[in-house]
Amino acid sequence: MEDDDEASRIIEAVLDSSARFGIPLYIETHRATIFQDIWRTVQFIRKHPDVRVNGDFSHWYTGQEFVYGGFEAKMQFIEPVLERVRFLHGRIGNPGSIQVDIGEDEAPYIGHFRALWTRSMEHFLRQASPGDFLCFVPELLSPRIYYGRVFRDAGGELREESDRWTQSLVLRKIAQDCFVKAQTLSDSAIGGRA
């Protein structure tokens, strides 16, 4: 609910605290926050280029309907955000839900998350200094807080759609694949500049 001036003061406070205490602080791409939509986030990044981001892209993917209106155009628009990601929340959503069971990595929208994560990782690798780190943390939340979906089983009982532990392992594998691809892209870009 913050207007742009209030949000800028929050961003400045985050940047000041991070510098003063030597602790990396990341602003999350999350609904109902100052970085809830791609337009506003990119504008704030332009105004505050030192911001570093926690990319929880499932909120944008579902809330901003990333599958409609040209996914690659949206990727290009959010490039300034992807350049600043230093923490990734590993959750995959679809056009209708922020957190879904992705099976064994076969759902069609997974490719979009692979692209978001790979590009974020590639930017990190190109900019990283010795000792820098990028966190990838699966974040699969409970139906009790309206993230994990529930459906009735054959007996009529409500059951959570997925096993969050198993899904975390799938997300971890996807992230590892993305990191390997990002390393290849980063290495070839650096080699091309040499």
Segments (PLM) and residue ranges:
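Active-site glycine-centered loops adjacent to acidic/histidine catalytic or metal-binding residues
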Residues: 56
